[in-house]
């Protein structure tokens, strides 16, 4: 969906997250900046992340580097903990929760990307918590039941917020 959203809105810049996990089979090396724990921890110590989190149960670290100046809006793909951190740094940040249409669809997507059973179970458990907390915290919730429709809805929200920054 993010790739489609970037096609629809050239004013968006996608922030490339860092992670300590290994690259999945078939995953593009450009999907993340893949680093070891020591490199990640050094970046934390240097204040180099806008937000970061350790994913529960896996020990993998994920983080969004402090953004360089950009002319457009910055798009972050982050977890709930990261969203809390971003809101503390920038209370005006717009949070859009994008969800799968159902828990079964979420599980199918995780299986489709090649995750192992243990990882799928952890993701689903975390996903249940994030759905509950995220819907309370998010400014907008979009159900990703169709990539083009969901990307279009997110693009519409962004256009609306640009036109009326204080809108809710």
Language-model segments: which ranges?
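Phosphate- and divalent-cation-binding pockets in alpha/beta enzyme and binding domains
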Residues: 1, 85, 105, 153
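A conserved segment at the C-terminal end of the G1
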Residues: 1-10
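Hydrophobic/aromatic beta-strand patches that form the interior of the parallel beta-sheet core
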Residues: 15, 33, 94-96, 140-142
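ATP-dependent small-molecule kinase phosphotransfer cores
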Residues: 17-74, 81
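Conserved nucleotide-binding/hydrolysis micro-motifs of P-loop NTPases
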Residues: 19-22, 80-82, 100-105, 147-148
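Conserved phosphate-donor/acceptor-positioning beta-strand/loop module used by diverse small-molecule
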Residues: 75-79, 88-111
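NTP-dependent small-molecule kinase module
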Residues: 91, 108-115, 132-168
């Amino acid at each position: 969906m993010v790739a489609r959203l970037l096609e629809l809105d050239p004013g968006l810049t996608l922030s490339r997250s860092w992670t300590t996990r290994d690259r999945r089979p078939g995953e593009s090396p450009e999907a993340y900046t893949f680093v070891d724990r020591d490199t990640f921890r050094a970046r934390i110590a240097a204040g180099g992340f806008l937000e970061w989190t350790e994913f529960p149960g896996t020990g993998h670290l994920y983080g969004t580097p402090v953004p360089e100046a950009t002319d457009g809006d910055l798009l972050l793909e982050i977890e709930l903990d990261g969203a809390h951190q971003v809101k503390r740094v920038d209370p005006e940040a717009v949070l859009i929760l994008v969800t799968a249409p159902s828990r079964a669809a979420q599980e199918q997507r995780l299986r489709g990307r090649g995750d192992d059973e243990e990882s799928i179970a952890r993701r689903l458990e975390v996903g249940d918590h994030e759905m509950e907390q995220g819907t309370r915290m998010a400014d907008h919730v979009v159900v990703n039941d169709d990539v083009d429709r969901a990307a279009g809805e997110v693009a519409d929200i962004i256009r609306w917020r640009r036109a009326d920054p204080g809108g809710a």
